[in-house]
Amino acid sequence: MQVILLDKIVHLGQVGDQVNVKSGFARNFLIPQGKAVMATKANIEHFEARRAELEATAAANLAAAQARAAEVTALGSVTIASKAGDEGRLFGAITTRDVAEAVTAAGVKIAKSEVRLPNGPIRTLGDHDVRFQLHGEVFATLDVIVVAE
């Protein structure tokens, strides 16, 4: 099924690309979420008229994500207190939600879906590097310090 991409899709294409995708992927994901439209003659003409507007929106989203990434890296580190045993292991774990709440409390609004924990939930005390994916191609790294309560 031929579709026109209205947003950058990782491993698929850029704004304005006409790509051939499976019909289920188009009907169930791309079209309902507003990331693509069917590649009919009318839609192609309509898209060409709106191309500059869509590219400007994509550029604005990228700039906003880069600004947020600069804010996250400017924080330097965030401290999270959690209950821990004598050997430095936590009772429970620090998840993406906990990291997102700590960063938001520090002054930068982050959604838990933007937090990337490469080794899974944090289960030990100490310093941990956490990566944030704020946009498809914008990443930020922050040092999360886990201390015992």
Swiss-Prot record:
The answer, when asked if Nucleus is one of the entry's keywords, is no
UniProt-listed SUPFAM superfamilies: L9 N-domain-like, Ribosomal protein L9 C-domain
InterPro entries in alphabetical order: Ribosomal_bL9 (IPR000244), Ribosomal_bL9/RNase_H1_N (IPR009027), Ribosomal_bL9_bac/chp (IPR020594), Ribosomal_bL9_C (IPR020069), Ribosomal_bL9_C_sf (IPR036791), Ribosomal_bL9_N (IPR020070), Ribosomal_bL9_N_sf (IPR036935)
Domain of life where this protein originates: Bacteria
Provide the coiled-coil residue spans.
none
Q: What Gene Ontology biological process does one annotation of this record name?
A: translation
Q: Which Gene3D superfamilies match?
A: Ribosomal protein L9, C-terminal domain (3.10.430.100), Ribosomal protein L9, N-terminal domain (3.40.5.10)
Q: List UniProt keywords, sorted A-Z.
A: Ribonucleoprotein, Ribosomal protein, RNA-binding, rRNA-binding
* Role, per record: Binds to the 23S rRNA.
* Record protein name field: Large ribosomal subunit protein bL9
The gene name on file is rplI
